[in-house]
């Protein structure tokens, strides 16, 4: 019986103080030049720029965007 009361108190306390939602990390604003060079990721085809992380395949600059030069030309074959 005591366990039931304790569980009820804990549940009500959790409901009274809801958990904070995790906010995604802030990214720097992208410049127009970077946005104009935005190209699709070769793995998942989702368009992304140098400032962001691909949501689909989780790749970053070293695995995906390193293939694009500063003019936005595909360097890998």
UniProtKB/Swiss-Prot annotation:
Contains 5 disulfide bonds. Keywords: Disulfide bond, Secreted, Signal, Toxin. Residues 1-16 form the signal peptide. Expressed by the venom duct. It is found in: Secreted. GO terms for cellular component: extracellular region. GO terms for molecular function: toxin activity. Residues 17-32 form a propeptide. It comes from the Eukaryota. Coiled coil: none annotated. The cysteine framework is VIII (C-C-C-C-C-C-C-C-C-C). The gene superfamily associated with this precursor was described as 'B superfamily' in PubMed:23152539, but this name was already assigned to the conantokin precursors, therefore the superfamily was renamed 'B2 superfamily'. Belongs to the conotoxin B2 family. This is Conotoxin Mr8.2. It comes from Conus marmoreus (Marble cone).
């Amino acid at each position: 019986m005591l366990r039931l009361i304790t569980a009820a108190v804990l549940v009500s306390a959790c409901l009274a103080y809801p958990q904070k939602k995790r906010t995604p990390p802030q990214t720097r604003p992208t410049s127009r030049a970077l946005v104009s060079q935005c190209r699709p990721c070769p793995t998942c085809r989702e368009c992304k720029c140098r400032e962001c992380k691909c949501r689909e395949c989780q790749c970053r600059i070293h695995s995906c965007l390193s293939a694009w030069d500063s003019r936005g030309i595909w360097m890998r074959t």
